[in-house]
Design a protein with these regions (language model features):
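Nucleotide/pyrophosphate-binding catalytic subdomain
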Residues: 1-259, 264
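A broad, low-specificity signal marking well-ordered, structured residues that form hydrophobic/aromatic
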Residues: 2, 138, 178, 194, ...
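Generic beta-strand/beta-sheet core signal
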Residues: 6, 36, 141, 180-182, ...
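Terminal amphipathic helices with adjacent charged low-complexity linkers/tails
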Residues: 35-42, 46-53, 64, 227, ...
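Intrinsically disordered, low-complexity boundary segments flanking structured domains
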Residues: 164-170, 261, 276, 298-301, ...
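A conserved regulatory-domain signal marking ACT and ACT-like small-molecule sensing domains
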Residues: 284-394
Length: 394
Protein backbone atom coordinates (compact mmCIF):
# COMPACT_ATOMS: atom_id res chain seq x y z
CA UNK A 1 0.00 0.00 0.00
CA UNK A 2 1.19 3.48 -0.89
CA UNK A 3 0.30 6.95 0.34
CA UNK A 4 0.45 9.67 -2.32
CA UNK A 5 0.27 13.34 -1.41
CA UNK A 6 -0.48 16.00 -4.04
CA UNK A 7 0.19 19.65 -3.21
CA UNK A 8 -1.61 22.80 -4.27
CA UNK A 9 0.21 23.13 -7.59
CA UNK A 10 -0.66 19.49 -8.35
CA UNK A 11 -4.38 20.21 -8.04
CA UNK A 12 -4.27 23.87 -9.05
CA UNK A 13 -4.83 23.63 -12.80
CA UNK A 14 -6.70 21.45 -15.27
CA UNK A 15 -3.40 20.10 -16.63
CA UNK A 16 -2.02 19.16 -13.21
CA UNK A 17 -5.19 17.61 -11.81
CA UNK A 18 -5.62 15.46 -14.93
CA UNK A 19 -2.00 14.36 -14.48
CA UNK A 20 -2.92 13.42 -10.90
CA UNK A 21 -5.80 11.33 -12.22
CA UNK A 22 -3.49 9.48 -14.61
CA UNK A 23 -0.87 8.85 -11.91
CA UNK A 24 -3.37 7.52 -9.37
CA UNK A 25 -5.37 5.40 -11.80
CA UNK A 26 -2.10 3.92 -13.09
CA UNK A 27 -1.30 2.47 -9.65
CA UNK A 28 -1.90 -1.26 -9.28
CA UNK A 29 -1.48 -1.19 -5.49
CA UNK A 30 -3.94 0.19 -2.96
CA UNK A 31 -3.30 3.91 -2.62
CA UNK A 32 -4.43 6.60 -0.24
CA UNK A 33 -4.32 10.01 -1.91
CA UNK A 34 -3.93 13.07 0.31
CA UNK A 35 -4.65 16.40 -1.36
CA UNK A 36 -4.05 20.06 -0.57
CA UNK A 37 -6.37 22.90 -1.49
CA UNK A 38 -6.25 24.20 -5.06
CA UNK A 39 -3.10 26.30 -5.46
CA UNK A 40 -3.51 29.74 -3.90
CA UNK A 41 -6.91 29.04 -2.32
CA UNK A 42 -5.69 28.86 1.29
CA UNK A 43 -4.12 32.32 0.94
CA UNK A 44 -7.31 33.58 -0.70
CA UNK A 45 -9.47 32.17 2.12
CA UNK A 46 -7.33 33.99 4.69
CA UNK A 47 -7.24 37.27 2.74
CA UNK A 48 -11.02 37.20 2.26
CA UNK A 49 -11.58 36.64 5.97
CA UNK A 50 -9.48 39.73 6.75
CA UNK A 51 -11.55 41.82 4.33
CA UNK A 52 -14.75 40.63 6.00
CA UNK A 53 -13.29 41.36 9.44
CA UNK A 54 -12.53 44.92 8.38
CA UNK A 55 -16.07 45.47 7.11
CA UNK A 56 -14.86 45.67 3.51
CA UNK A 57 -17.64 44.53 1.18
CA UNK A 58 -15.09 43.51 -1.45
CA UNK A 59 -14.85 40.22 0.47
CA UNK A 60 -17.95 39.20 -1.50
CA UNK A 61 -16.12 39.54 -4.83
CA UNK A 62 -13.21 37.49 -3.50
CA UNK A 63 -15.63 34.83 -2.31
CA UNK A 64 -17.29 34.72 -5.73
CA UNK A 65 -13.85 34.41 -7.36
CA UNK A 66 -13.16 31.27 -5.32
CA UNK A 67 -16.58 29.87 -6.18
CA UNK A 68 -16.04 30.50 -9.87
CA UNK A 69 -12.61 28.88 -9.85
CA UNK A 70 -13.93 25.65 -8.35
CA UNK A 71 -16.96 25.56 -10.66
CA UNK A 72 -14.75 26.10 -13.71
CA UNK A 73 -12.42 23.32 -12.58
CA UNK A 74 -15.31 20.89 -12.18
CA UNK A 75 -16.76 21.83 -15.55
CA UNK A 76 -13.39 21.30 -17.26
CA UNK A 77 -12.47 17.90 -15.78
CA UNK A 78 -15.70 16.00 -15.01
CA UNK A 79 -17.42 14.67 -18.15
CA UNK A 80 -20.02 12.39 -16.56
CA UNK A 81 -23.11 14.57 -16.07
CA UNK A 82 -24.47 12.52 -13.17
CA UNK A 83 -21.15 12.70 -11.30
CA UNK A 84 -20.86 16.40 -12.10
CA UNK A 85 -24.34 17.13 -10.77
CA UNK A 86 -23.66 15.31 -7.50
CA UNK A 87 -20.30 17.04 -7.07
CA UNK A 88 -21.73 20.50 -7.76
CA UNK A 89 -24.44 19.87 -5.17
CA UNK A 90 -21.75 19.11 -2.58
CA UNK A 91 -19.67 22.14 -3.58
CA UNK A 92 -22.77 24.38 -3.43
CA UNK A 93 -23.45 23.19 0.12
CA UNK A 94 -19.87 23.84 1.25
CA UNK A 95 -19.81 27.30 -0.29
CA UNK A 96 -23.13 28.16 1.36
CA UNK A 97 -21.61 27.23 4.72
CA UNK A 98 -18.52 29.30 3.99
CA UNK A 99 -20.62 32.25 2.81
CA UNK A 100 -22.52 32.24 6.10
CA UNK A 101 -19.29 32.21 8.11
CA UNK A 102 -17.86 35.15 6.15
CA UNK A 103 -21.10 37.09 6.57
CA UNK A 104 -20.97 36.50 10.32
CA UNK A 105 -17.39 37.79 10.46
CA UNK A 106 -18.44 40.83 8.41
CA UNK A 107 -21.38 41.62 10.70
CA UNK A 108 -19.75 41.27 14.12
CA UNK A 109 -16.18 42.24 13.15
CA UNK A 110 -14.73 39.24 14.97
CA UNK A 111 -12.37 36.58 13.63
CA UNK A 112 -11.39 34.19 16.40
CA UNK A 113 -8.74 31.48 15.83
CA UNK A 114 -11.57 28.93 15.91
CA UNK A 115 -13.45 30.67 13.09
CA UNK A 116 -10.24 31.21 11.09
CA UNK A 117 -9.44 27.48 11.35
CA UNK A 118 -12.93 26.63 10.13
CA UNK A 119 -12.58 29.01 7.18
CA UNK A 120 -9.23 27.66 5.94
CA UNK A 121 -10.51 24.08 6.21
CA UNK A 122 -12.78 24.60 3.20
CA UNK A 123 -9.87 24.57 0.73
CA UNK A 124 -9.03 20.92 1.35
CA UNK A 125 -12.64 19.92 1.88
CA UNK A 126 -13.52 21.23 -1.58
CA UNK A 127 -10.48 19.88 -3.43
CA UNK A 128 -10.82 16.40 -1.93
CA UNK A 129 -14.42 16.11 -3.14
CA UNK A 130 -13.29 17.13 -6.63
CA UNK A 131 -10.42 14.61 -6.72
CA UNK A 132 -12.55 11.81 -5.26
CA UNK A 133 -15.11 12.36 -8.03
CA UNK A 134 -12.45 12.65 -10.75
CA UNK A 135 -10.52 9.45 -9.96
CA UNK A 136 -12.40 6.36 -11.10
CA UNK A 137 -13.36 4.06 -8.23
CA UNK A 138 -12.16 6.44 -5.53
CA UNK A 139 -13.82 6.92 -2.14
CA UNK A 140 -13.41 10.02 0.01
CA UNK A 141 -12.57 9.74 3.70
CA UNK A 142 -12.95 12.76 5.96
CA UNK A 143 -9.76 13.51 7.90
CA UNK A 144 -11.77 15.58 10.38
CA UNK A 145 -12.92 12.20 11.71
CA UNK A 146 -9.49 10.70 12.40
CA UNK A 147 -6.73 13.36 12.54
CA UNK A 148 -6.91 14.57 16.15
CA UNK A 149 -5.09 17.40 17.91
CA UNK A 150 -4.66 18.60 21.49
CA UNK A 151 -3.82 22.03 22.86
CA UNK A 152 -0.28 22.60 24.17
CA UNK A 153 1.16 26.02 25.01
CA UNK A 154 -1.77 27.58 23.18
CA UNK A 155 -1.04 25.70 19.95
CA UNK A 156 -2.74 22.72 18.33
CA UNK A 157 -0.43 19.70 18.16
CA UNK A 158 -1.07 16.19 16.92
CA UNK A 159 -2.39 13.62 19.38
CA UNK A 160 -0.29 10.81 17.91
CA UNK A 161 -1.74 7.83 19.75
CA UNK A 162 -5.41 8.71 19.33
CA UNK A 163 -4.84 9.60 15.67
CA UNK A 164 -2.92 6.39 14.86
CA UNK A 165 -5.71 4.25 16.32
CA UNK A 166 -8.38 6.25 14.50
CA UNK A 167 -6.51 5.95 11.17
CA UNK A 168 -6.21 2.17 11.55
CA UNK A 169 -9.90 1.85 12.32
CA UNK A 170 -10.99 4.17 9.48
CA UNK A 171 -8.98 2.39 6.79
CA UNK A 172 -9.51 -1.17 8.04
CA UNK A 173 -11.80 -1.92 5.09
CA UNK A 174 -10.54 0.71 2.66
CA UNK A 175 -11.18 0.76 -1.06
CA UNK A 176 -8.33 0.44 -3.59
CA UNK A 177 -8.32 4.20 -4.23
CA UNK A 178 -8.95 6.41 -1.21
CA UNK A 179 -8.92 10.22 -1.15
CA UNK A 180 -8.29 12.28 2.00
CA UNK A 181 -8.21 16.06 2.58
CA UNK A 182 -4.83 17.03 4.04
CA UNK A 183 -4.01 19.77 6.55
CA UNK A 184 -7.28 19.71 8.51
CA UNK A 185 -8.02 18.06 11.83
CA UNK A 186 -10.28 18.33 14.89
CA UNK A 187 -9.60 18.88 18.57
CA UNK A 188 -9.72 15.58 20.45
CA UNK A 189 -11.74 17.03 23.32
CA UNK A 190 -13.98 19.70 21.79
CA UNK A 191 -14.41 18.43 18.24
CA UNK A 192 -13.66 21.92 16.92
CA UNK A 193 -11.92 22.18 13.54
CA UNK A 194 -8.16 22.70 13.81
CA UNK A 195 -5.27 22.19 11.40
CA UNK A 196 -1.70 20.93 11.27
CA UNK A 197 -0.20 24.23 10.10
CA UNK A 198 1.07 25.37 6.72
CA UNK A 199 2.47 22.33 4.90
CA UNK A 200 0.18 20.18 7.01
CA UNK A 201 -1.00 18.07 4.07
CA UNK A 202 2.47 16.51 3.90
CA UNK A 203 2.15 15.77 7.60
CA UNK A 204 -1.31 14.22 7.15
CA UNK A 205 0.11 11.88 4.52
CA UNK A 206 3.04 10.91 6.73
CA UNK A 207 0.77 10.24 9.72
CA UNK A 208 -1.42 7.93 7.63
CA UNK A 209 1.58 6.17 6.06
CA UNK A 210 3.13 5.49 9.47
CA UNK A 211 -0.12 4.30 11.07
CA UNK A 212 -0.80 1.85 8.23
CA UNK A 213 2.85 0.75 7.68
CA UNK A 214 2.78 1.87 4.06
CA UNK A 215 5.35 0.63 1.57
CA UNK A 216 6.27 4.19 0.59
CA UNK A 217 5.15 7.80 1.00
CA UNK A 218 5.19 9.74 -2.26
CA UNK A 219 5.13 13.55 -2.18
CA UNK A 220 4.00 14.85 -5.59
CA UNK A 221 4.87 18.48 -6.20
CA UNK A 222 5.98 20.84 -8.99
CA UNK A 223 9.73 20.09 -8.85
CA UNK A 224 11.78 16.97 -9.62
CA UNK A 225 12.88 16.60 -5.99
CA UNK A 226 15.43 18.15 -3.65
CA UNK A 227 17.94 20.33 -5.47
CA UNK A 228 21.55 21.01 -4.51
CA UNK A 229 20.55 24.68 -4.15
CA UNK A 230 17.69 27.01 -5.02
CA UNK A 231 17.68 26.92 -8.86
CA UNK A 232 16.33 30.49 -8.90
CA UNK A 233 19.60 31.58 -7.30
CA UNK A 234 22.08 28.92 -8.47
CA UNK A 235 21.26 28.09 -12.09
CA UNK A 236 23.54 25.02 -12.17
CA UNK A 237 21.70 23.31 -9.29
CA UNK A 238 20.60 19.73 -9.98
CA UNK A 239 18.35 17.09 -8.41
CA UNK A 240 19.71 15.01 -5.53
CA UNK A 241 18.94 11.31 -6.13
CA UNK A 242 19.06 10.11 -2.52
CA UNK A 243 19.07 11.68 0.93
CA UNK A 244 19.02 10.25 4.42
CA UNK A 245 16.18 11.25 6.75
CA UNK A 246 18.61 13.41 8.74
CA UNK A 247 19.94 15.18 5.63
CA UNK A 248 16.42 15.85 4.35
CA UNK A 249 15.35 17.17 7.75
CA UNK A 250 18.31 19.55 7.86
CA UNK A 251 17.61 20.89 4.36
CA UNK A 252 13.91 21.32 5.19
CA UNK A 253 14.62 23.08 8.47
CA UNK A 254 16.93 25.48 6.68
CA UNK A 255 14.61 26.60 3.94
CA UNK A 256 14.23 23.81 1.36
CA UNK A 257 10.43 23.91 1.01
CA UNK A 258 10.07 20.59 -0.78
CA UNK A 259 8.75 18.73 2.28
CA UNK A 260 7.16 20.09 5.47
CA UNK A 261 9.77 19.23 8.19
CA UNK A 262 7.44 17.40 10.67
CA UNK A 263 6.54 15.02 7.81
CA UNK A 264 9.80 13.12 8.13
CA UNK A 265 9.61 11.89 11.73
CA UNK A 266 6.53 9.57 11.60
CA UNK A 267 7.81 7.63 8.57
CA UNK A 268 11.43 7.69 9.74
CA UNK A 269 10.44 5.77 12.89
CA UNK A 270 8.78 3.11 10.73
CA UNK A 271 11.65 3.13 8.18
CA UNK A 272 9.23 4.02 5.37
CA UNK A 273 10.97 5.70 2.41
CA UNK A 274 9.77 9.04 1.06
CA UNK A 275 9.85 9.72 -2.67
CA UNK A 276 9.57 13.29 -3.92
CA UNK A 277 8.16 13.31 -7.46
CA UNK A 278 7.06 15.88 -10.04
CA UNK A 279 3.40 15.84 -11.09
CA UNK A 280 4.35 17.62 -14.32
CA UNK A 281 7.23 15.20 -15.03
CA UNK A 282 6.12 11.85 -13.56
CA UNK A 283 8.82 9.85 -15.37
CA UNK A 284 11.59 11.67 -13.49
CA UNK A 285 13.21 9.56 -10.76
CA UNK A 286 12.89 12.36 -8.22
CA UNK A 287 14.54 12.18 -4.80
CA UNK A 288 14.30 9.19 -2.46
CA UNK A 289 14.66 9.77 1.29
CA UNK A 290 15.62 6.74 3.36
CA UNK A 291 17.44 5.73 6.53
CA UNK A 292 20.87 5.26 4.98
CA UNK A 293 22.45 6.25 1.66
CA UNK A 294 24.82 3.63 0.25
CA UNK A 295 28.10 4.56 -1.44
CA UNK A 296 27.72 8.24 -0.64
CA UNK A 297 30.64 10.00 -2.35
CA UNK A 298 29.40 13.57 -1.76
CA UNK A 299 29.74 14.77 1.84
CA UNK A 300 27.93 18.04 1.04
CA UNK A 301 24.47 17.39 -0.40
CA UNK A 302 23.00 20.84 -0.77
CA UNK A 303 22.80 24.44 0.38
CA UNK A 304 19.61 26.02 1.69
CA UNK A 305 18.61 29.20 3.47
CA UNK A 306 15.97 30.65 5.75
CA UNK A 307 14.79 34.20 5.28
CA UNK A 308 12.95 36.01 8.04
CA UNK A 309 15.43 35.12 10.77
CA UNK A 310 15.89 37.09 13.98
CA UNK A 311 19.08 36.74 16.03
CA UNK A 312 18.57 37.39 19.75
CA UNK A 313 21.65 37.84 21.93
CA UNK A 314 21.53 37.03 25.64
CA UNK A 315 24.62 38.65 27.16
CA UNK A 316 26.18 39.59 30.48
CA UNK A 317 29.48 39.27 32.29
CA UNK A 318 27.73 37.28 35.03
CA UNK A 319 27.11 34.43 32.55
CA UNK A 320 30.77 33.35 32.50
CA UNK A 321 31.11 29.97 34.17
CA UNK A 322 27.52 29.99 35.45
CA UNK A 323 25.68 26.68 34.98
CA UNK A 324 22.04 26.74 33.90
CA UNK A 325 21.75 29.98 31.90
CA UNK A 326 21.14 28.20 28.59
CA UNK A 327 18.69 25.84 30.27
CA UNK A 328 16.68 28.85 31.45
CA UNK A 329 16.74 30.37 27.94
CA UNK A 330 15.40 27.26 26.22
CA UNK A 331 12.92 26.35 28.97
CA UNK A 332 11.38 29.83 28.98
CA UNK A 333 11.02 29.85 25.19
CA UNK A 334 9.68 26.28 25.04
CA UNK A 335 7.04 27.01 27.67
CA UNK A 336 5.79 29.79 25.40
CA UNK A 337 5.78 27.65 22.26
CA UNK A 338 8.72 29.44 20.61
CA UNK A 339 11.07 27.30 18.52
CA UNK A 340 14.82 27.94 18.34
CA UNK A 341 16.55 26.67 15.19
CA UNK A 342 20.09 27.97 15.70
CA UNK A 343 22.38 28.51 18.70
CA UNK A 344 25.82 30.11 18.97
CA UNK A 345 27.82 30.74 22.15
CA UNK A 346 30.86 32.98 22.52
CA UNK A 347 34.01 31.15 23.60
CA UNK A 348 34.18 33.39 26.67
CA UNK A 349 30.66 32.20 27.61
CA UNK A 350 29.53 35.80 28.20
CA UNK A 351 26.87 35.66 25.47
CA UNK A 352 24.57 33.22 23.71
CA UNK A 353 22.84 34.02 20.41
CA UNK A 354 19.75 32.17 19.26
CA UNK A 355 17.91 32.15 15.94
CA UNK A 356 14.10 32.41 15.86
CA UNK A 357 11.57 33.32 13.19
CA UNK A 358 10.85 37.02 12.71
CA UNK A 359 7.21 36.41 13.64
CA UNK A 360 8.28 35.05 17.05
CA UNK A 361 10.93 37.71 17.73
CA UNK A 362 8.89 40.23 19.71
CA UNK A 363 7.41 37.58 21.99
CA UNK A 364 10.80 35.85 22.43
CA UNK A 365 12.47 39.10 23.53
CA UNK A 366 9.66 39.78 26.03
CA UNK A 367 9.85 36.24 27.43
CA UNK A 368 13.63 36.39 27.90
CA UNK A 369 13.58 39.88 29.40
CA UNK A 370 11.03 38.60 31.90
CA UNK A 371 13.01 35.43 32.64
CA UNK A 372 16.18 37.40 33.40
CA UNK A 373 14.49 40.51 34.83
CA UNK A 374 16.33 40.27 38.17
CA UNK A 375 19.74 39.99 36.48
CA UNK A 376 18.92 42.86 34.11
CA UNK A 377 17.82 45.09 37.01
CA UNK A 378 21.09 44.50 38.90
CA UNK A 379 23.21 45.00 35.78
CA UNK A 380 24.49 41.44 35.82
CA UNK A 381 22.95 40.95 32.36
CA UNK A 382 22.00 43.28 29.51
CA UNK A 383 18.48 43.63 28.05
CA UNK A 384 17.93 41.31 25.11
CA UNK A 385 19.30 42.54 21.79
CA UNK A 386 17.47 41.44 18.62
CA UNK A 387 18.43 41.80 14.95
CA UNK A 388 15.62 41.00 12.52
CA UNK A 389 15.36 40.61 8.75
CA UNK A 390 18.35 38.28 8.53
CA UNK A 391 18.86 35.03 6.61
CA UNK A 392 20.40 31.75 7.73
CA UNK A 393 22.48 29.80 5.21
CA UNK A 394 23.33 26.14 5.81
Amino acid sequence: MKVLKFGGTSVGSVESILSLKKIVEGENDDVIVVVSALGGITDKLIATSKLALGGDESYKAEFEFMQKRHYEMVDAIIDDEEKKSGLLHTIDRLFEELKSIYYGVYLIHDLSPKIQAAIVSYGERLSSHIVATLVNGAKRYNSLDFIKTIKKHGKNVLDSEVTANAVKETFRNRTQKSVVPGFISTDRNTGEITNLGRGGSDYTASIIAAALDAEVLEIWTDVDGFMTADPKVIHTAYTINELSYVEAMELCNFGAKVVYPPTIYPVCVKNIPIKVKNTFNPDSAGTTILSHVENDSKPIKGISSIKGTTLITVAGLSMVGVIGVNRRIFTALAENGISVFMVSQASSENSTSIGVRDVDAEEAVAVLNNEFSKEIRTGAMFPMHAESGLATVA
